[in-house]
C-alpha cells in the first residue's frame, strides 16, 4: 500500500473510531475530530486515491476555475463539472423568483423520497440550463461569493484602487525571494465571508522552498472527509506541481492540516466500503512543459498516467 494513501485511510479509521458525535449546519450529523495532519511526498506519485475512483477531470476544471479568478459556476458546467451546483441552486429555490415545487431541505429529502427526488432532478435541470444559457440568471444565481479563486486573483485592495492578484504576486516572490516566509495564499476575508454561498473551507496555504524543492502546506478549517478531502489533496498537489513548473523548482511535499475533520453520518457505510478495498500504485502527473504561465493551462495540458483504481463509491452531498 502507498504510504501516501495509507495515511488517508488510517485517519478515516481514527475519525470513525474516536470522533465525537456532532450535529452540524446541514442537519446531517457527523463523526468529528479536531486537528489532524497528513504529509504527501509527491516524489512517490501523484496522491489521487486508488481505493475508490476519484474524478480527476473535475479536480482539473475546478482548479482552472479558481486560477481564472472566477466565482460563477457556468465555467464548471461547461466542463460537465457539477460539484458546486447545490449551493447556487439552494440560493435560487429559496428566492422569490423561484416558482416551482417546494425544495426545502432538498439534500436530505432526495435521499428519503423517490417522488421528491424526481422533482428535484427536474428543477435542477432547469437551473443548470438557465445558468448555461441565460446571462442575467447566471449573474444573479450562478455565483458563490468571494471565495477561493475570486480572492486568489481579486482580493479587495484596502486603498480602493483595484485588487490584489495573490497568485501573480506569489509566483513572482518565489522566483525572486524563495527563502521568504511570506509565501502565503489566503481565501478567508472576514468582511465578505458572511455573504458567501459557502465560506471557503481550505482557507490558507503557505509555500516553502529549500534545496531546490518547493512544498505547500494548506490549512482547511472544515473537511468533508469522504467526499471533499480526496479532491482537496489532489487539487492542492496539482496546484503545487503547477507552481513548481512555473518557478523552475522540483516538487516536494503537500502537507494537509485540518481543523474539523468529519465524516457525515450518511457517509459512514461508504467509507467503510472504501476501507475494505485494495489500494494500487499511485499515478503519475504530466504537465505540458510548453505552458509559459500558470494562467494558460488548459484541460488538455494536465494529464494523469497509470491511474489504476477501484470503483466509484457514491454518497450524497451535505448542503
Swiss-Prot record:
Pfam family, one: Thymidylat_synt
Annotated positions binding (6R)-5,10-methylene-5,6,7,8-tetrahydrofolate: 224, 318
Active site: 201 (nucleophile)
Domain of life: Bacteria
Xref: CDD domains: TS_Pyrimidine_HMase (cd00351)
Enzyme Commission no: 2.1.1.45
Compartment list: Cytoplasm
Alphabetical list of InterPro entries matching this protein: Thymidate_synth/dCMP_Mease, Thymidate_synth/dCMP_Mease_dom, Thymidate_synth/dCMP_Mease_sf, Thymidylate_synthase
Gene Ontology CC terms: cytosol
Alphabetical list of NCBIfam families matching this protein: PRK01827.1-2, thym_sym
Matching HAMAP family: Thymidy_synth_bact
PANTHER family named among the record's database cross-references: THYMIDYLATE SYNTHASE, THYMIDYLATE SYNTHASE 1
Biological role stated in the UniProt entry: Catalyzes the reductive methylation of 2'-deoxyuridine-5'-monophosphate (dUMP) to 2'-deoxythymidine-5'-monophosphate (dTMP) while utilizing 5,10-methylenetetrahydrofolate (mTHF) as the methyl donor and reductant in the reaction, yielding dihydrofolate (DHF) as a by-product. This enzymatic reaction provides an intracellular de novo source of dTMP, an essential precursor for DNA biosynthesis.
Protein name stated in the entry: Thymidylate synthase
Originating organism: Oenococcus oeni (strain ATCC BAA-331 / PSU-1)
Gene: thyA
Amino acid at each position: 500500500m502507498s504510504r501516501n494513501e495509507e495515511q488517508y485511510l488510517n485517519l478515516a479509521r481514527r475519525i470513525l473510531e474516536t470522533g465525537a458525535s456532532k450535529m452540524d449546519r446541514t442537519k446531517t450529523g457527523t463523526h468529528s475530530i479536531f486537528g489532524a495532519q497528513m504529509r504527501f511526498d509527491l516524489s512517490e506519485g501523484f496522491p489521487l486515491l486508488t481505493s475508490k475512483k476519484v474524478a480527476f477531470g473535475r479536480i482539473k476544471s475546478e482548479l482552472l476555475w479558481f486560477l481564472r479568478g472566477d466565482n460563477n459556476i457556468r465555467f464548471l458546467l461547461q466542463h460537465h463539472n457539477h460539484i458546486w451546483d447545490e449551493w447556487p441552486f439552494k440560493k435560487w429555490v429559496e428566492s422569490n423568483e423561484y416558482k416551482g415545487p417546494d425544495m426545502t431541505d432538498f439534500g436530505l429529502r432526495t435521499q428519503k423520497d423517490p417522488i421528491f427526488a424526481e422533482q428535484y432532478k427536474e428543477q435542477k435541470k432547469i437551473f443548470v440550463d438557465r445558468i448555461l444559457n441565460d446571462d442575467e440568471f447566471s449573474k444573479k444565481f450562478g455565483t458563490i461569493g468571494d471565495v477561493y479563486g475570486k480572492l486568489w486573483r481579486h482580493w479587495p485592495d484596502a486603498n480602493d484602487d483595484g485588487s490584489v492578484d495573490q497568485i501573480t504576486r506569489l509566483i513572482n516572490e518565489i522566483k525572486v525571494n524563495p527563502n521568504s516566509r511570506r509565501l502565503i495564499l489566503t481565501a478567508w476575508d472576514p468582511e465578505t465571508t458572511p455573504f458567501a454561498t459557502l465560506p471557503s473551507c481550505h482557507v490558507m496555504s503557505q509555500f516553502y522552498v529549500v534545496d531546490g524543492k518547493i512544498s505547500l502546506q494548506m490549512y482547511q478549517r472544515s473537511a468533508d472527509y469522504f467526499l471533499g478531502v480526496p479532491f482537496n489533496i489532489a487539487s492542492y498537489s496539482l496546484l503545487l506541481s503547477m507552481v513548481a513548473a512555473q518557478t523552475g523548482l522540483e516538487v516536494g511535499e503537500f502537507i494537509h492540516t485540518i481543523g474539523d475533520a468529519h465524516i457525515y453520518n450518511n457517509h459512514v457505510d461508504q467509507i467503510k466500503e472504501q476501507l475494505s478495498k485494495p489500494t494500487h500504485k499511485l499515478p503519475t502527473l504530466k504537465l505540458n512543459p510548453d505552458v509559459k504561465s500558470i494562467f494558460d493551462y488548459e484541460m488538455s495540458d494536465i494529464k494523469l498516467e497509470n491511474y489504476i483504481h477501484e470503483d466509484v463509491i457514491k454518497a450524497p452531498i451535505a448542503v
